Amino acid sequence: VFLAVALNKVTSYYTHTAHAPVKSLTKACTTGHATNIIEGIALGYESTVAAIVVIGGAILLSVLTYAGTPPMFIAYGVAMAGIGMLTLTGNTISMDVFGPVADNANGIGEMGYDPEAMEAARPGSYRRARQILADLDAVGNTTKAETKGIAIGSAVIAAVSLFSSFIAVIAVGSEDRIGMMTVEQY
């Protein structure tokens, strides 16, 4: 659960319009194409490193929690970290749906508004409505990115768990003898 929350925070930092990475990318966009590409690639690499550190920390924490036990218990602990992430599936799916809903609201707003009629009725209302829809779209994009981070994080944890099981079977020769495996064999 802590891994999912940490991945949400990291992803939000790198994708939300209020934080420094997006602001620096916006500034790079104003200076030219080359700086925009360089800044975008640099931010992509930086955000990847942050996510890897968070996922690696979660795996290390689960390994340290089961330290001193047989290797299969350690692998079980890593698998439980993945199960803990999947307990938030309902939240993740509802956050994932918010992005397309915000996009649809923006599209309906673009098709349904008559700028001249709105400005005649209430001056400045069209500009405010467009800004609200743009903000809603930005939040939708951020939540979509956060859910992708959770999906990737749980996939990494599952892959580590499956790989450790594969190594265990290869090391002892059969599934029946995994319980007798020692750390040296692993």
Feature-to-residue mapping (PLM):
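Hydrophobic packing and interface segments
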Residues: V1-Y186
